[in-house]
Amino acid sequence: MLKRHYTILFLFFCLSAARAQFPAHPDSVYTFIKYNSVWSNTIKDWQPVDAGFKKQISQARTVRDTINCFLKVLEQLNDVHSYFIYRGEYFGHYKPQDSATYARLRPVLRRSQTEKEQFSTTMLPGSIVYVRVPSINVFAADEVNRFAQSLHDSVVQYSSQKPKGFIVDLRLNSGGNMYPMLAGLGPLLGNTVLGYETDMDGNEVRKWEIQNGNFVTGGYTATAIRQTGKPVFEKLPVAVLTGPVTGSSGSMTAIAFKQRPHTVFIGEPTAEGYTTSNGYFTYGNTLIFLFATSFVADRNKNMYKYAVPVDIMIKAEDDFDNLLQDAKVKAALQWLKGK
């Protein structure tokens, strides 16, 4: 009988220790997810989810066990964009890919990692400017402004060459911070509304726009770059290239070009499930929760719940080293030639 008491006390101690290490009360985090997820309405009956979470959390022995309880909820919500960062380690629910799909995407995924924060521009035949915008994972204000300014300057440097159109390549843009991306591409977008964040019912939460060359979201001016004059390319035709690695802020940047006049989308749809807007929530000093709380709509309020579609579908191998041999770039040049 005494041994049984020790066992009960030991299990209680393990459970208490796990909860003590987790920097928030698990029930409060669960309730927050349940009532604030943009996908909440997709679960018609929450009782089985409630019961499953209660059972799983009662068996949690470590912080990782506790986080796995929340990942199970994200799985049931089919939410692949939300994730936790605990002491620098990332935890999320990600859909498995078959070996053939992964083999096809692996070179692009690898390149998207090696080219982070490395813009690339060049003049192609026909006076078409090619602009590659990869992931930009910077969040400090000075870094955001530095990258926004750099991208802006990389675009406007072609003013004297009188370009006839642009190709904006987002195929290596798997996410990061959209503020420097959109401000930097302001000369192409113009001073205008770019899109909206909406709740699960499509009601506007906040508006995105370019004002005086800087990105503004919900009235907050997110960048402070020096302008070289009014947007000079806002009326030129633009071909936007996307693919299955384009996601998160890469998808947001694509949406900002949707409904822009004289604009076409070429390639493949963006990564499925990464078109939600994530809020940033902290718990103590060790836990960060990037949580999908809004959908995103373009300037005409068309919502993109799952992915950003293309106008011209081309499923072919990418050739970033020989752009004139790249099937999507060739299609973009052909489309721009007729404009």
Give residue ranges: language-model regions.
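Bacterial Sec-dependent N-terminal signal peptides
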Residues: 1-22
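Short, charged/polar micro-motifs that form catalytic or ligand-binding hotspots
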Residues: 10, 171-175, 243
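Flexible, low-complexity junctional segments that flank or bridge functional domains
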Residues: 20-210, 216, 252, 278-288, ...
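Short, surface-exposed secondary-structure junctions/capping segments
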Residues: 86, 320-330
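Short, contiguous clusters of charged residues that form electrostatic/catalytic patches at enzyme active sites
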Residues: 149-153, 222-223, 330
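Conserved acidic, small-residue-rich alpha-beta core segments centered on
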Residues: 179-324, 335
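C-terminal alpha-helix
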Residues: 329-339
